[in-house]
Amino acid sequence: GKSTLLRCLSRADAEVGSYSFTTLSPNFGVMRFGPDGHMFSQDDRNEHEMQRLTVADMPGIIKDASKNKGLGHEFLRHIERCSMLVYVIDFGPTNPRPSSEVLILNRELEQYRPGLIDRVALVAANKADLLGGTHNPYTEEDAREKLLRFRQDVDMIFEPRSVPVIPISAKHQLNIDRMAKHLQSRCTL
């Protein structure tokens, strides 16, 4: 999910796999924006570029990473260098409690370096396209309810700060422009 998202945002050539921990070291890409704020595609070489944003795809953080489980400290050191963080959470039907992933990420970041969670700019609910589809037991109403519950959970987790939740599909590029605009607006503050 994260590597696919990096490819959508920056056209980077990150390895994508259908198994956990495909990414073992950071991958980098550059988002490019035009004068009107739209994100350039790789083909937009002749247009006037106004802003760039470097994006890093980090290896997944697991429970007890802050205690150096796995390659925890090595991965967390990379995250520490980032000025803004986006949590990419599996929001598909096989993950009934996506908010638990947010809690784990917050706990690991905060235990590793207090204040690191203040850099979280948004939560991307990835695989949102899988909810309410024709070959899916979820109905559209179930999907809306799951998203509403998730947004409420995220609000409580980050309170008093507001961290937006944007449902996306990196694979199908659903809401990628919306996410890019939000990140760009955070960089110009």
PLM feature spans:
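Phosphate-binding active sites in nucleotide-utilizing proteins
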Residues: 3, 22-26, 68
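A conserved segment at the C-terminal end of the G1
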Residues: 3-15
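Fold-independent oxyanion-binding glycine-rich loops
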Residues: 8-9, 27, 58-59
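Short beta-strand-centered segment that lines the nucleotide-binding/catalytic pocket of NTP-utilizing
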Residues: 12-32
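Flexible beta-alpha connector loops of hexameric P-loop NTPases
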Residues: 13-15, 59-68, 92-98, 135-136
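Nucleotide phosphate-binding site architecture
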Residues: 22, 62-63, 131
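Conserved C-terminal guanine-recognition region of P-loop GTPase G domains, centered on the G4
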Residues: 31-51, 72-187
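Activation loop entry of protein kinases
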Residues: 54-56
